[in-house]
């Protein structure tokens, strides 16, 4: 039986999905993170705005009376000096994937290996987004994570039956920020971001590292988010959409 379902989202006008014998709830948890999503992302990396959800917009969204919860994802690109174990993991992954890599991707790997630093998709996440993560292994608590002493790391081959870990819980991750700050974090777990809230552009050689929202702002001094994810109270979807249209989209037509 094939079922056609139209899902209205702010980030796009309409998504029509064909679902056949599929666990839609599991799909939704990974790929459709919230009822509404706002950002200033574009189809091309060169023209995108990773800081489109400003503090002013966050303030407006946080006051929406019909929303159940609103979460934020912050992004910056950092670099990380690879420990021997991480380098070995990436050497194994490169050998496995090189036949499928483009010449450009192979060049990126050679440069990564030569200077022994890997690109980091560094994400700050609020509690509402933390609750959306897809965990590999034991889940940590928000109360522990929000202390700012820990990071959550992504893992490779995330959509396969045997994903590959970059780090193990209990290991130390040394972060050297682009602004000169340094801090040692404990790795508290491995988790995958919902697809729609993750870094949206094609990339091959990188790791994803997450810290709580407050820690991200403290270390990077960036208060503007990449994404806002809003869940409406039951039966209040229309009211939330009207609130967003009137108070956010009317003032900034770059937000989708």
Go through each PLM region and give its residues.
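Basic-flanked hydrophobic alpha-helices used for secretion and membrane insertion
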Residues: 20, 24-256
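Short, strongly hydrophobic transmembrane alpha-helices
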Residues: 1-23
């Amino acid at each position: 039986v094939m079922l056609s379902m139209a899902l209205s989202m702010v980030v796009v006008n309409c998504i029509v999905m064909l679902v056949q014998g599929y666990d839609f709830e599991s799909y939704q948890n990974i790929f459709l993170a919230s009822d509404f999503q706002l950002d200033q992302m574009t189809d091309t990396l060169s023209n995108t705005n990773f800081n489109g959800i400003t503090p002013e917009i966050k303030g407006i969204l946080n006051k929406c009376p019909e929303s159940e919860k609103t979460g934020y994802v912050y992004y910056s690109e950092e670099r990380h000096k690879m420990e021997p174990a991480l380098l070995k993991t990436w050497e194994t992954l490169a050998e496995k994937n090189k036949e499928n890599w483009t010449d450009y991707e192979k060049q990126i790997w050679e440069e990564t290996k030569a200077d022994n630093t890997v690109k980091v998709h560094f994400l700050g996440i609020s509690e509402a987004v933390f609750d959306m993560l897809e965990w590999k292994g034991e889940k940590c608590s928000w109360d522990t994570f929000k202390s700012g002493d820990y990071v959550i790391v992504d893992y490779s081959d995330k959509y396969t039956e045997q994903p590959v870990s970059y780090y193990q819980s209990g290991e130390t991750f040394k972060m050297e920020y682009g602004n000169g700050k340094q801090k040692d974090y404990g790795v508290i777990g491995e988790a995958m971001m919902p697809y729609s809230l993750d870094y949206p552009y094609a990339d091959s050689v990188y790791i994803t590292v997450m810290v709580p929202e407050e820690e991200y702002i403290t270390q990077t001094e960036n208060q503007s988010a990449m994404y806002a994810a809003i869940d409406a109270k039951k039966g209040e979807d229309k009211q939330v959409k009207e609130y967003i249209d009137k108070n956010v989209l009317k003032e900034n037509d770059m937000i989708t």
